[in-house]
């Protein structure tokens, strides 16, 4: 294995640069996005090709595979050195990088981001490269920004997705109140308006993570959201309605009138509203919401 001393120097220089700037320099964004994709993007199956092009692609794929393995090992050992590491150590350099020697000598440098727009920049890069659902990426974000862990691994992209539950099963599982709210969901209202009647619905779906069947996310699309929220969380809902009414006097009247008369199938979705730090209410003109 080649010596890690020159590479180590570059890694800690990158750490110092991030720590001093307290953000990600603009001239590093493109490179960082590419390296994040190598570390966190799903593995692609090799495509069969002939000749020189196939050989070049095989070499590039082999480099990415080795780099991905080393990058993820660094993430596991010290998340705070991960970003400087992938900025300083290229996939080509990973081929001869002595990771065991580096980890033996490495001393944690602590956190490099304390407060700024770095978190938003990283989420932006992740979305650009379609890795924002990666469990490894989310672990990185939790560690370097001290975010709360997800309630379930099903929040990532590595999950089974189940659809088309039957209406009788939904009533049996959730009872009449939830069932009636689901029957008022935009999906059900639209289906009935088009004359489509079925015992199955897209208004309930489930995500089960690949690696665990002990937890899952069950999502319900409902109508009459404020009425249902008032049943489940009466005190909090009253505060939310009060705040919304102060912003728009028509909000409370519209949602409670729909709770009585039912939603207008001609209504179109409006934007969601976020209230303070404790309440997040997703409102539409047909009063649909999602409970997880």
Curated annotation (Swiss-Prot):
Its main location: nucleus. A motif (Bipartite nuclear localization signal) lies at residues 48-70. This is Hypoxia responsive morphology factor A. Induction: Expression is induced during murine pulmonary aspergillosis. It is found in: Nucleus. Residues 156-186 are annotated as: RNA recognition motif (RRM)-like domain. The N-terminal bipartite nuclear localization signalis required for nuclear localization and generation of the H-MORPH morphotype. The RNA recognition motif (RRM)-like domain is not required for nuclear localization but is necessary for induction of the expression of the HAC cluster genes such as cgnA. Hypoxia responsive morphology factor that modulates the expression of the subtelomeric hrmA-associated cluster (HAC) containing genes that alter the hyphal surface (such as reduced total chitin or increased beta-glucan exposure) and perturb inter-hyphal interactions within the developing biofilms, resulting in a loss of vertically aligned polarized growing filaments. One of its GO terms (biological process) is cell adhesion. Keywords: Cell adhesion, Nucleus, Virulence. GO terms for cellular component: nucleus. Belongs to the hrmA family. Disruption phenotype: Impairs the formation of the hypoxia-typic morphotype and restores classical biofilm architecture. Changing residue 179 to A: Impairs the induction of expression of cgnA. It comes from Aspergillus fumigatus (strain ATCC MYA-4609 / CBS 101355 / FGSC A1100 / Af293) (Neosartorya fumigata).
């Amino acid at each position: 294995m080649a010596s890690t001393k020159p590479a180590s120097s570059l890694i800690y220089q990158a750490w110092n640069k991030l720590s001093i700037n307290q953000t990600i320099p603009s001239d590093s964004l493109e490179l960082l996005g590419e390296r994040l994709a190598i570390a966190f993007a799903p593995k692609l199956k090799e495509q069969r090709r002939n000749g020189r092009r196939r050989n070049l692609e095989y070499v590039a794929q082999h480099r990415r595979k080795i780099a991905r393995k080393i990058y993820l090992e660094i993430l596991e050992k010290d998340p705070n050195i991960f970003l400087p590491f992938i900025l300083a150590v290229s996939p080509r350099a990973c081929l001869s990088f002595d990771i065991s020697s580096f980890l033996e000598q490495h001393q944690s440098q602590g956190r490099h981001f304390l407060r700024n727009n770095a978190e938003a920049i990283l989420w932006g890069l992740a979305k650009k490269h379609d890795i924002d659902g990666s469990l490894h990426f989310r672990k990185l974000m939790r560690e370097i920004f001290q975010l709360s862990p997800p309630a379930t691994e099903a929040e990532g992209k590595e999950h089974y997705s189940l659809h088309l539950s039957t209406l009788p099963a939904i009533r049996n599982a959730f009872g009449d109140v939830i069932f009636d709210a689901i029957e008022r969901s935009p999906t059900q209202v639209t289906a009935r308006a088009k004359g489509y009647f079925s015992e199955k619905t897209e208004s309930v779906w489930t995500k089960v993570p690949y690696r665990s069947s002990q937890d899952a996310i069950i999502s319900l699309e409902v109508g009459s959201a404020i009425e249902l929220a008032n049943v489940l969380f009466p005190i909090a809902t009253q505060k939310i309605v009060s705040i919304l009414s102060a912003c728009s006097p028509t909000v409370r009247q519209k949602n409670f009138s729909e709770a009585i008369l039912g939603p207008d199938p001609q209504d179109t979705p409006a934007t969601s509203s976020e209230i303070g730090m404790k309440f997040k209410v997703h409102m539409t003109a047909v009063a649909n919401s999602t409970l997880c």
